A protein has these predicted regions:
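Walker A (P-loop) phosphate-binding loop of ABC-type ATPase nucleotide-binding domains
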Residues: 37-41
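Conserved ABC transporter NBD signature motif
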Residues: 51, 55-68, 72-73
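ABC transporter nucleotide-binding domain
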Residues: 166-252
Length: 291
């Protein structure tokens, strides 16, 4: 059974189509990055998945309709939107008490074990913690819930690089396994590239690319080309071209790397560079990627 399956998923706000006919399937044991510019439909998609907004089309999350079966669904789903959602007046111990009282699959002992690895005291109030410590507290609570699906919407927004790294390290080492699925949105794409198993690019309410990381590595190639070889490189029909330190960087889709290596240095593009090429719309050829 798919964890998430959407067919023709739509959501409109007046004349604005926040989601415009999305088809998506997410299997067990995947870490999916949902990537798009502001206003692309990322948060609306997550809200639909979490049963926080109505929708048109067909959407099943863990086999349930999230809008009509949300109470049952949320027993198997955890969500982090932003660390600021924790009340500033509450003590750490009281936060654990509260979650234990409302969520039947919360393991308080496990949350306390996670917190022993931090400098957070159980008697501290949230307002006494740094933003990074609040993120650690929130993650400890979420990881102590035995959920099959974890949804993260900009979970490290505003944190410094050290806390961001600790956040994702804890997520991978202490929570993720092949029986769980994670969906994450973030603007810090370069920091989660090595964490993801799959990516979805969304723009203007439509999905423009769905790919596993393995497929990206085999399908897309960047070539750094000197001026002398630029015409030969362009003849191979790159989908995107940019300049870097006096050299041309061309992005190719399904072009043999051996041919590209003969005219320049080759590498797999970063997710950020691929996103700019596909979603930026700066090359007419990029439209061939739209699904």
């Amino acid at each position: 059974m798919s964890v998430i399956e959407a067919r023709g998923l739509r959501k409109s706000f007046g004349a604005t189509h926040a989601l415009d006919g999305i088809d998506l399937r997410v299997e067990d044991g995947r870490i999916l990055g949902l990537i798009g510019p502001n206003g692309a439909g990322k948060t609306t998609a997550l809200n639909a998945i979490l049963g926080l907004t109505s929708f048109q089309g067909d959407l099943r999350v863990l086999g349930r309709n999230p809008w009509t079966e949300r109470d049952l669904l949320m027993r198997d789903v955890s969500f982090i939107a932003d660390v600021a959602v924790l009340p500033r007046w509450i003590r750490v111990s009281n936060a654990l008490d509260y979650v234990g009282g409302v969520h039947p699959r919360f393991d308080r002992a496990q949350a306390e074990r996670f917190l022993t690895r931090t400098s957070i005291r159980s008697t501290s109030k949230v307002r006494e913690l740094s933003k990074g410590m609040v993120a650690q507290l929130h993650l400890a609570i979420v990881m102590a819930i035995d959920a099959r699906l974890l949804v993260l919407d900009e979970p490290t927004l505003g944190l410094d690089i050290l806390y961001r790294k600790q956040f994702y390290d804890s997520l991978l080492n202490d929570y993720f396994d092949r029986n769980r699925t994670i969906v994450v949105t973030t603007h810090q794409v370069e920091e989660i590239q090595d964490v993801l198993t799959d990516v979805v690019f969304i723009d203007r309410g439509r999905i423009v690319l769905v790919s596993s990381m393995e497929e990206i590595e085999s399908r897309f190639t960047e070539s750094l080309v000197s001026p002398a070889n630029l015409d030969a490189a362009r003849a191979l029909k790159p989908i995107y071209e940019r300049q870097s330190l006096g050299r041309s960087v061309l992005l190719f889709d399904r072009v043999d790397r051996t041919r590209l290596a003969a005219i320049g240095d080759v590498r797999t593009p970063s997710i950020a560079d691929l996103f700019v090429a596909v979603v930026g719309g700066r090359s007419a050829q990029a439209q061939g990627l739209v699904q």
